[in-house]
A protein has these predicted regions:
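Long, contiguous bundles of hydrophobic transmembrane helices that form the permeation core
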Residues: 2-26, 30, 206-312, 440, ...
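Membrane-interfacial loop-to-helix junctions in multi-pass transporters
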Residues: 19-23, 75-82, 109-129, 158-168, ...
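Hydrophobic mid-bilayer segments of alpha-helices in multi-pass membrane transport proteins
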Residues: 22-34, 40-62, 81-89, 171, ...
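Transmembrane alpha-helix interface/packing and boundary motifs in multi-pass membrane proteins
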Residues: 33-40, 92-93, 132-141, 173-181, ...
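Core transmembrane alpha-helical segments of multi-pass membrane transporters/permeases
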Residues: 45, 69-103, 279, 287, ...
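Hydrophobic alpha-helical transmembrane segments of multi-pass integral membrane proteins
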Residues: 84-88, 114-155, 328, 353-393, ...
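Re-entrant/interfacial helical elements at transmembrane boundaries that shape
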Residues: 89-90, 103-107, 144-157, 186-197, ...
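Membrane-core helix-loop-helix motifs of multi-pass transport proteins
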Residues: 155-254, 419-457, 463-466
Length: 466
């Protein structure tokens, strides 16, 4: 990220553009981009065109920007995320192709869903998936790792529960979003807060717990409402029509459920508990899956050969290349925005928002998460803007940490976000199908929770302990 930013900063402005006009162009380009992707436009093409429009409208030299800043952003993103993505996606492919995901789904069905019927049965499936996302998030699974390993499980649960796919991405991401905001979890929002604010992962825990409780309450109310609504409309499992590759209906477990959870348990213990390198642990998990799931990964002939493994792993490699393109496009757009001459003015406005300083700080962290291209970078930007003046404004470091944990999650899940695209494409959905549920469980509920958290921090500073 630093390399991309530094190379961009060295690019001279081609011509002067009034600050107000440049900011209008940036905001308009972003809004049109979000709408286009929501309506089904290719996000790589849309982000590239938006970057060009921003260059023209803000005075950045378009040739230098598109030939230097944008490729450098792609390279930086690949350097940071490629191996992690590759291992996550291959592991998810192994779970789906072997039937291990089906085994985990059946285990969950026996333990949680039981013999319930009708709408109650469907509701239990959805609430169970929300809980799975929350538990795995608390366990240290970040969004991408959870998406690529748990979506196959979710698809099998959705088929068994006769639920439409449109609800799955929002349900899983709702649980993960709650975990990201929860004090004490080993996720980026908490870990990076230690670096930027010098606080503990449990900073301002009481407001944080209240905020997460509000998020989950909104999620549950929404799930109860939407499942009944879909049931009345007669909406059912629609994966077969969309070409989602699934084991045949009614197929018995090809992989023992206990064996199926071993790779996930391995990741939890080694990454979350022991703090080992994620890529190395994922690679070992892939080897474990290849060995433990061998009864499920079979070629057409009775004899097990390496060709089937090659097909599954090859499909994972192809999906990785596609996802890196989506992620790189979003990151490149963020780098273009950050390096416009109007960006410093835009961020400077945050400190001038009238009223309680916590309001301006919340807005800065929320918008920073989008413009900087990630929630972590958004938290870094908010701390850089408000850190030097926090004491004079009466803002404490623990409060900044906890508010930022909620705020950066709000606009980090807009339609052009890599995790949102990954979750949507993994379910073979269009953005307009999946995003209404995602917006409710990761944007609207988090916004409400953040407002409550900011109010608690401002009204009861004694609750904001580091």
């Amino acid at each position: 990220m630093a390399e991309a930013a530094s190379s961009a900063a060295a690019t001279a402005v081609a011509y002067a553009v009034p600050t107000a006009l440049g900011i209008i162009v940036i905001l308009a380009a972003v809004l049109v981009l979000m709408y286009a992707v929501y309506k089904g436009a290719n996000s790589i093409l849309a982000c590239t065109l938006a970057s060009m429009v921003i260059c023209i409208g803000t005075g950045l030299p378009i040739v230098d920007t598109m030939e230097t800043i944008v490729p450098n952003a792609y390279a930086t993103q690949i350097q940071m995320m490629f191996m992690k993505f590759l291992c996550c996606i291959i592991l998810g492919q192994l779970y789906q192709a072997s039937g291990a995901a089906l085994s985990v789904a059946h285990l969950v069905e026996k333990v949680v869903v039981g013999k319930s019927t009708g709408t109650a049965r469907k509701t239990r499936y959805v609430l169970c998936m929300l809980g799975i996302g929350l538990v795995f998030g608390i366990g240290g699974f970040d969004t991408f790792l959870a998406v690529f390993t748990l979506i196959p499980v979710g698809l099998n649960m959705w088929r068994d529960g006769d639920l439409p796919r449109a609800l799955l991405p929002g349900t899983l991401m709702g649980g993960l979003s709650a975990a990201a905001c929860l004090p004490g979890t080993p996720l980026f929002a908490n870990m990076m807060g230690q670096m930027f604010f010098g606080t503990n992962t449990t900073a301002a825990r009481i407001p944080g717990y209240v905020g997460v409780a509000i998020m989950l309450a909104i999620d549950v109310v929404y799930i109860l409402h939407i499942v009944k609504k879909y049931d009345k409309k007669g909406l059912h499992w629609d994966g077969d029509e969309a070409g989602v590759e699934m084991p045949p209906p009614g197929e018995k477990d090809r992989v023992n459920p206990i064996l199926a959870i071993i790779p996930l348990a391995w990741i939890f213990v080694t990454v979350t508990v022991l703090g080992k390198d994620m890529v190395v642990c994922l690679f070992v998990a892939i080897i474990l899956a290849c060995v433990l799931f061998c009864n499920g990964i079979k070629a057409e002939t009775p004899r097990l050969t390496g060709s089937k493994y090659g097909q599954v792993i090859g499909a994972g490699c192809t999906q990785t290349a596609v996802m890196m393109g989506f992620m790189g496009a979003q990151f490149a757009l963020a780098q273009v925005v950050i390096n416009t001459p109007q960006f410093d003015t835009l961020t400077g406005w945050f400190t001038k928002i009238p009223g309680n300083p916590y309001i301006g700080y919340s807005v800065a962290a929320s918008l920073g998460g989008f413009f900087a291209g990630s929630s972590v970078a958004g938290m870094q930007m908010a701390s850089a803007i408000y850190g030097p003046i926090a004491d004079s404004l009466g803002i404490t470091a623990p409060a900044m940490h906890r508010i930022a944990a909620f705020a950066v999650s709000i606009l980090d899940t807009i339609p052009i976000n890599g995790a949102v695209i990954a979750t949507t494409t993994s379910c073979k959905l269009k953005m307009k199908q999946s995003y209404p549920a995602i917006a409710m469980t990761t944007v609207i509920n988090v916004t409400v929770a953040m407002i409550v958290v900011a109010f608690m921090c401002a009204a009861f500073p004694g609750l904001c302990q580091s």
